[in-house]
Amino acid sequence: MVHVRAKDAVGQYGERVAVRRLTEAGMTVLDRNWRCRSGEIDVVARDGDCLVVCEVKTRRSVSAGTALEAVTPQKLARLRRLTGEWLAAHPGVNPPRVRLDVVAVTVPERGPATVQHVAGVS
């Protein structure tokens, strides 16, 4: 039997919600949870001719700050480096534009999750 920590389950749920939001917005998901030695990219998608690298942050409440506040300048710098590594690992992908997005998901104890998609955060 595989045991999933509650925090991990919330994060996985948030990523599923985020992917649904991105696809409903017309994007095509190219990769999920891509990992390399330097870290992980939550979602890589295509929005027209633009490659979108998306950080997903999920919170149960805003008591420790919002999900968007958790995306620091250091996190964005790391995401930019990871984007370069993803592109190097996928030589057939040569987008004319690359954009970093954040999808913030808040999962309350009751009721539906709230989702905020911020395009072009860096």
Swiss-Prot record:
User: Mind telling me which Pfam families this protein's record contains?
Assistant: UPF0102
Record's protein name: UPF0102 protein Krad_1407
Q: Domain of life here?
A: Bacteria
The entry assigns this protein to a family as follows: Belongs to the UPF0102 family.
The record's listing under InterPro entries reads: Restrct_endonuc-II-like, tRNA_endonuc-like_dom_sf, UPF0102_YraN-like
One MF term in the entry's GO annotations = nucleic acid binding
Q: Source species, please?
A: Kineococcus radiotolerans (strain ATCC BAA-149 / DSM 14245 / SRS30216)
